[in-house]
A protein has these predicted regions:
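Bacterial signal peptide processing site
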Residues: 15-18
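Beta-strand signatures of extracellular beta-sandwich domains
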Residues: 51-57, 98-102
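Short acidic/polar inter-strand loop motif in beta-rich domains
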Residues: 100-114
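Sec-dependent signal peptide recognition
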Residues: 1-7
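A short, amphipathic beta-strand motif
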Residues: 31-39
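C-terminal motif of bacterial Sec signal peptides marking the signal peptidase cleavage site
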Residues: 10-13
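A beta-strand/beta-hairpin structural motif
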Residues: 68-89
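Extracellular beta-sheet/turn segments enriched in Thr/Pro/Gly and aliphatic residues
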Residues: 20-21, 36, 76-80, 120-138
């Protein structure tokens, strides 16, 4: 009887996805690249513990779609942000987005005086994106 129930379960659970499910939209939810330093800021990396915080947001909404936090990374830092890093799984990483990289002694979301930042626009699904940290928050 158990074998029969397992067989019935497998038959009904292995149905094809509906044709209107946009698999490519979900498959391409990534951005891959490097975070680099402008030469003028290389000496300003904090001593001791610090965090690299990379955020992805669309061009209309200030709330990030995805965030990656890394403690004391080596530079140039190679990153890949995928849909697994999304803050809200109802939002989709797609189209043109703004990537921001920030070096901070705090792992918090708020920008603080002394943080080092850089940003660039990128297309979701792109590899080879470069974010250059070139600004100090005053």
């Amino acid at each position: 009887m158990i074998k029969f129930l397992i067989l019935i379960f497998l038959i009904f659970s292995c149905q094809p996805l509906p044709k209107d499910v946009p698999l490519e939209k979900y498959r391409n939810q990534f951005i891959e690249g490097q975070v680099l330093f402008d030469d003028s800021l290389k000496g300003k990396v904090p001593k001791g513990d610090y965090f690299l915080i990379i955020s992805v947001r669309d061009l209309e909404n200030p709330m990030p779609i995805a965030v990656l936090r890394v403690k004391k990374p080596k530079f140039p830092y190679h990153f890949k942000i995928t849909g697994r890093r999304k803050l809200n799984h109802d939002r989709i990483m797609e189209g043109q987005v703004l990537l921001t990289a920030r070096i901070s002694v705090s792992d918090k979301a708020e920008i603080q005086k002394g943080d080092l930042m850089g940003s660039t626009n990128a297309l979701v699904g792109t590899r080879g994106v470069k974010i250059i940290i070139n600004t100090e928050v005053k």
